[in-house]
UniProtKB/Swiss-Prot annotation:
This protein's encoding gene: slc50a1
Name of the protein in question: Sugar transporter SWEET1
Pfam families: MtN3_slv
InterPro entries: SWEET, SWEET_rpt
TM spans (from-to): 9-29, 44-64, 70-90, 106-126, 138-158, 167-187, 191-211
Family as reported in the entry's similarity comment: Belongs to the SWEET sugar transporter family.
Principal subcellular localization: Golgi
Superkingdom classification of source: Eukaryota
Organism for this UniProt entry: Dictyostelium discoideum
Membrane topology: Multi-pass membrane protein
Limits of the MtN3/slv domain: 12-92, 134-217
Length: 220
């Protein structure tokens, strides 16, 4: 009976994590379509899309090592969307120098991905556990660095007492996403899944709190 309850809980959490995460991956689609329509990236930051490709690639690699079909499915979809975003963002950068700089960032991400995979597989021919630990740790570090990027924006919000630019729907979805993957990781007893997502949940909660404390204002 207890096993059945745990299995039902796992199925429910898998569904929630999958649905919410894919929804988050789809959300930038509207922005990218506007960029394509205007043939200009405007003030949209493109690094987020490169980071998303790198993050998805690393977790796909981790999912393959651990035979985690849920993570494999979600991050494969996320990677496809993210590559689409990166390509169309780069294609619509009007300045030659900015376009080259963006390509350099893409190349750096590729080198970083290859380096992480190489470190994870180095001298671990018959040692799957070490390979999993290395890749899980390094993927978590990259994940945590991504989550830390909104901290600068939060500091600006606190100083200006204005949360303009923070979207409440995204913050809510991010919180739910972090919580669902945290529970998923805890059920699997996988520290490399639940630890970075605990941090993601905390940061999303802080964002929601800031939006509540400092409602968005249009500054003239």
């Amino acid at each position: 009976m207890e096993d059945e309850k745990n299995e039902n809980l796992m199925t429910f959490i898998q569904f929630c994590a999958t649905f919410i995460t894919i929804t988050l991956f789809i959300m930038p689609l509207k922005t990218i379509r506007l960029i394509i329509e205007k043939k200009n990236v405007g003030t949209v930051a493109g690094l987020q899309f490169i980071s998303s490709v790198l993050n998805c690639f690393l977790w796909i690699s981790y999912a393959l090592l651990t035979s985690n079909t849920t993570m494999l499915f979600v991050n494969s979809i996320g990677m496809m969307f993210s590559i689409y975003y990166v390509f169309n963002y780069w294609k619509n950068i009007n300045q030659v120098r900015a376009s080259r700089d963006y390509l350099k960032k893409v190349m750096i991400a590729c080198v970083l991905a290859i380096t992480i995979i190489s470190i994870s597989y180095y001298n671990t021919v018959d040692d799957l556990d070490t390979r999993i630990s290395r890749l899980g740790f390094l993927s978590s570090v990259v994940c945590v660095l991504m989550f830390a990027s909104p901290l600068e924006k939060m500091a600006i919000v606190i100083q200006s007492k204005n949360s303009e630019g923070m979207i409440i729907n995204v913050a809510i979805l991010s919180l739910l996403c972090g919580l669902s993957w945290t529970i998923f990781g805890l059920l699997l007893n996988d520290i490399y899944i639940y630890l970075p997502n605990i941090l993601a949940s905390i940061l999303s909660f802080v964002q929601l709190t800031l939006i509540k404390l400092y409602p968005p204002q249009i500054l003239l």
